[in-house]
Amino acid sequence: MTIQEFRDYMASGKPVVGGGEVHMMFHQLSQEALRITAEINGKYHTPEELHTLLEQLWGREVPKTVGMFPPFHTDCGKNTIVGERVFINTGCKFQDQGGITIDEGALIGHNVVLATINHDLDPARRQSMSYAPIHIGKNVWIGANATVLAGVTIGDGAVVAGAVVTKDVEPNTIVGGVPAKVIRKIDV
């Protein structure tokens, strides 16, 4: 299975069967992500060196204007798309099997978790996993320690303030709390 076939399968919404081809690809990609993130997190890198490592990790071209302060963690890496002028602060964790898209100008604060995987609520089926993409719009600011769950879209210009985001966020809106609730609209 190629990386593109993996991405296409994950976008299809079909289940991942334990021991199947996609599940085995998970393991392969996880091992590669562990190796690359250990390199990213293990020592200082110039911005140019870090950029090269991010392209290896994400398996695609990364805009030169993307910035990151390590450490950074991911358990897949190959299903993240990042736009121009995105900044990812220290301590972030991306669980990107379901797909993460971060549009241009977005700011991702310290210790943010983006989780595209869910487990079944029924204890008898809890080992099963479902996947849904996360989409972060243009010029979004996700503040420190926020968590964004599978299937969420955060609209352009929104601000997420220390929240657990379980539902879509409208553009130009500030949300906060657990679970995230609208605080106010942003006048633009």
Task: Name what the model sees in each region.
Residues 160, 177:
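Conserved G/P- and acidic residue-centered "switch" motifs that form tight phosphate/ATP-binding loops
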Residues 1-65, 180-184:
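Terminal amphipathic alpha-helical/low-complexity segments used for targeting or macromolecular assembly
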Residues 172-173:
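Extracellular disulfide-bonded cysteine-rich modules/repeats
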Residues 72-153, 178-188:
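Flexible, glycine/small-residue-enriched loop-and-beta-strand segment within the central core
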Residues 144, 161-164:
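Active-site-proximal glycine-rich helix-loop-beta segment
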